């Protein structure tokens, strides 16, 4: 065995073995328990970053652990390879998105292999290939036939200069990123999938996701946003028109003093015909943001329409205002405003001098709305026949009255909107719909699928090549001329079903149900919590669509979800001659001084610039604080990088990148290597004989088996990989101090090392593979079994008891494991140190905590 640990040499050899033996390629096996481990697949941006490495190391640790449990483990990988970044890169590099994407895939694939991840590469998929998106197109046509797909107009960002649609990322400070023209909102026809048809099931089934983090489940519940309320009809004074409003607080109905409607509401547009100020306001709203996050923080503005609404119970007339905080595509596009009991309505009423009336008061205490609205539930007053009712009583009484008079109905609403899947981009899967010469819109016939996206294109940075090329859209359907849809799918479409395609990636159908139902659902899914409300919701939705199409027989796509934390690194900058910040990579910082608490007080880069240290923050290109994994692998080896990633932090928390920690991980592996090397060099022919062991040898063996038990629980149940590593490190300290003089000494070290390399195999597989062989095992470590705890080794012959006198530790005594209190007391009282502290005093009380503590109280 080589004395020195040489990571680059052993990692290349081990990776070649895995490749040549197709170690991680699996097929269905009804005789073995399956385990499907999946990490969210990467976008092929060009290079892996440390966030990828953390995600994929966690996944690989879980997969390798389960493999050694004897399970049939599937761990696939692929590429989420459509999307806007490829278009931008193609424009900048004067190429097309396809070659840029495929080149990146090859580079990143090599990086993944260098890190030693045990993927079944025979199942690799790239979502930008027709072999993949063909089935997505096919499934979309089936959803259309089931009535789950429809087309309607929706708002997009429009650049009037380039006459093109912009993604949100291409709008910078309200202007086009390319030509700096102010961006407008434009209504264009787009395709939607009815996720709202599954809202109730998506919400209810969250309760079945026992293996998902509570935070993710709460975020999804809030995103789906089920509410119970009343939809009521308000008349419009002086006309036969009416409009509907939904509220979850009908108890406040008697306090309505105005109604707010969206700028795009038909009533606002009607009133604007004779109101220039309103017309201008509507135009401004059209070109402003419509995201809920922005609405919450932006200035609330409005214009009176001159119209009045008729209160459905009192008949009182209240003014109708067009307001920028009401969205036409959310709810009914109108809200009843109760400034006495809603803070936003209160601030708007104060700003425009509108009436504020209180109709709810606290059960106890005084009502005060002089500075703010009273928004709590309470008791009604100033509400006529409803006075004195609490929230529930008022809700029911007012709802019943509105229903009885034909002016309202009880209703369950969801915050969730239907999924708009149209994108006016090029690099995406073409939407498989065609428009016939007579204007009829139908799905592309199955025998014409896939609708292939041309890859040999020129990007002008303005218009999608398939929109610019009028010939591409022309086709024939059933002998008739037709035009193809030139929008492409939202890339969340591809990532919503990729996990299922891995089960049968070569199948000449969307899924092979037999294979899919063997592997699905995913047993362990790993990815960032930032995907909680988009990808992870569409992922669940698509699984239900697949189930209802008869392709899978489970209700949910993944049993367990682990959301790993971000990777942070130090960030440094200096100000250049123009006062602009220049961010410097931590790898280029050559001098740092720290205070006694370890905080950086001074830093200088390799060019001599004195730097400002801004602390730890998420690795990013903008702050130039990303650490290239490849640089670290070349310097320390893949196993060291993997070990640091698992040891530095619990998986759900942020991980602070510290090269000193990486160096520590490297030293630990070298210690393990040396211990194994020293052991292998000796005569280890004597077999372990438990009956011959001394108490010291039994104690060391007990530590080995306690470590096996802890690591098994930490990785398998708790998923606390950092404490698993810490436990092995602690055991290593014991092993390094242990004598290797006798045959039984070495037999225990041998048992310990064969356990340790298997315990660490999921985390540092190259070293473990090599040491397993060096320790004389004839089978491959991948075909071995996870170490099993010898329960008899955990049984202690003796216990160490702490002896206290008046609350202070005065001695530690060793007693037989089965010693009773009288025996322990006798031994404790006979200890020299204890005798000294009891001299001249009277023992008043003795407390014994079995197996742990003897406490003597004396005065």
From Swiss-Prot:
A motif ('HIGH' region) lies at residues 42-52. It comes from the Bacteria. A motif ('KMSKS' region) lies at residues 618-622. Its EC number is 6.1.1.4. ATP binds at residue 621. It holds the Pfam family tRNA-synt_1. Keywords: Aminoacyl-tRNA synthetase, ATP-binding, Cytoplasm, Ligase, Nucleotide-binding, Protein biosynthesis. It catalyses: tRNA(Leu) + L-leucine + ATP = L-leucyl-tRNA(Leu) + AMP + diphosphate. InterPro entries: aa-tRNA-synth_I_CS, aa-tRNA-synth_Ia, Leu-tRNA-ligase, Leu_tRNA-synth_edit, M/V/L/I-tRNA-synth_anticd-bd, Methionyl/Leucyl_tRNA_Synth, Rossmann-like_a/b/a_fold, tRNAsynth_Ia_anticodon-bd. NCBIfam families: leuS_bact. HAMAP family: Leu_tRNA_synth_B (MF_00049_B). Belongs to the class-I aminoacyl-tRNA synthetase family. This is Leucine--tRNA ligase.
